[in-house]
From Swiss-Prot:
It is an enzyme of class 4 (lyase). This is 3-dehydroquinate synthase. One of its GO terms (biological process) is chorismate biosynthetic process. It catalyses: 7-phospho-2-dehydro-3-deoxy-D-arabino-heptonate = 3-dehydroquinate + phosphate. The gene is aroB. One of its GO terms (cellular component) is cytoplasm. Belongs to the sugar phosphate cyclases superfamily. Dehydroquinate synthase family. Zn(2+) binds at E184, H247, H264. Pathway: Metabolic intermediate biosynthesis; chorismate biosynthesis; chorismate from D-erythrose 4-phosphate and phosphoenolpyruvate: step 2/7. It is found in: Cytoplasm. The keyword Zinc applies. NAD(+) binds at residues 70-75, 105-109, 129-130, 142, 151, 169-172. Binds 1 divalent metal cation per subunit. Can use either Co(2+) or Zn(2+). It comes from Francisella tularensis subsp. holarctica (strain LVS).
Length: 359
């Protein structure tokens, strides 16, 4: 069973997302014909899927691999340099090269950024192997590496040629990674009331990993993101900002833990709860709404407990570095109801007061 949808960005060529019930890498062959191919993956995914992927490629391709360490802390300049050096050492040229990102969000982000900057832009293909990367980071063209002072601070908007993925990857995906991915899925439920209702009615099947339901879940998640990206690919109008619900708080959590604590999806889960509480603090939603929204998050196995190893001062400083901020104004994606999120400006003092009473 295959589900296919199209992403139509504002400024970039359209491309397809292919969601498969089985794992058939032959779907990407048309995109690598007569190409030099560099497969970028990590040590974990390489052991599971690299051999199968390489076996699916035709014999006359010039194929190289670049295997990075696994973890958010390796989404770094050093890892980027390793990819670029591999390209240069093997004389990969702009018009004949395609990068393949075989892995989760870290691999997709860093490979996409390498593709964006190598010789001013080369083709790349996304093969996301985690739920989170399937529904979020592989779609929409955001590519980046982290800096010691902040997450995703060095990057570019750069779209892939195609996204191919399969729910078969879940067979080797740790449960913690699956639940982390569900946080990004639940985020879309707050953006779309129809999806909120669909998730609510299919919760048991999702948690049981029913194949047909999961394909539909991934497809619907990608459709929501694709619709937003089509309106505001490069975050010029503010429409795309709603995709960052939970991320202002979440990114600060990751930064404070040096990207070695909560996984990205876990941090987003906590971040959404923080954004919900902040919305209640500001009078945008009632106490009962805040409880209901947080209960919905938790019902999918997602923890919303704030880490106890983060001090408020450090957390506040990390939030001040958020990319949405401008002219010393803090910007947050806040919620007024299911399907009603908005980008709002708040003062540093307002945030400090909220943090004082919420700890």
């Amino acid at each position: 069973m295959i589900s296919k949808l199209s992403v139509n960005p504002t400024f970039s060529p359209s491309y397809n997302i292919i969601v498969d019930s089985v794992l058939d890498f032959s779907h990407i062959l048309e995109y690598v014909t007569n190409k030099q191919v560099l497969v970028v993956t990590n040590t974990t995914v390489a052991k599971l899927y690299l051999t199968k992927f390489l076996a699916a490629l035709v014999d006359d391709l010039d194929v190289r691999t670049c295997i990075l360490e696994d973890g958010e802390q390796y989404k770094s300049q050093q890892s980027l340099d390793k990819i670029l050096s591999t390209l240069l050492e093997n004389h990969f040229t702009r018009n004949s090269t395609v990068l393949v990102a075989l892995g989760g969000g870290v691999i997709g982000d860093i490979t996409g950024f390498a593709a964006a900057i190598y010789q001013r832009g080369i083709d790349f293909i996304q093969i996301p192997t985690t739920l989170l990367s399937q529904v979020d980071s592989s779609v929409g063209g955001k590519t980046a590496i982290n800096h010691q002072l902040g997450k995703n601070m060095i990057g570019a908007f750069y779209q892939p040629k195609v996204v191919y993925t399969s729910i078969e990857f879940y067979k080797t995906l740790p449960q913690r990674e699956y639940i982390a991915g569900m946080a990004e899925v639940v985020k879309y439920a707050f953006i779309s009331k129809d999806f909120y209702l669909w998730l609510d009615s299919n919760r048991d099947k999702i948690l049981a990993k029913d194949s047909v339901t999961l394909i539909e879940m991934v497809k619907r998640s990608c459709q929501i993101k694709a619709q937003v990206v089509a309106m505001d690919e490069k975050e010029l109008t503010g429409a795309r900002a709603i995709l960052n619900f939970g991320h202002t708080f979440g990114h600060a959590i990751e930064k404070c833990q040096n990207y070695r604590g909560l996984k990205h999806g876990e941090a987003v889960g906590v971040g959404m709860a923080q954004a919900i509480d902040f919305s209640h603090y500001l009078g945008l939603i009632s106490q009962q709404q805040a409880k209901d929204f947080k209960d919905f998050i938790v019902s999918f196995g997602i923890s919303i407990d704030f880490p106890n190893d983060i001090c408020q001062k450090e957390f506040l400083e990390a939030m001040l570095l958020d990319k949405k901020n401008s002219n010393k104004e803090l910007k947050f994606i806040l919620i007024e109801n299911i399907g009603s999120l908005s980008l709002q400006k708040q003062s540093k003092n307002e945030l400090e007061q909220f943090l004082d009473i919420s700890r």
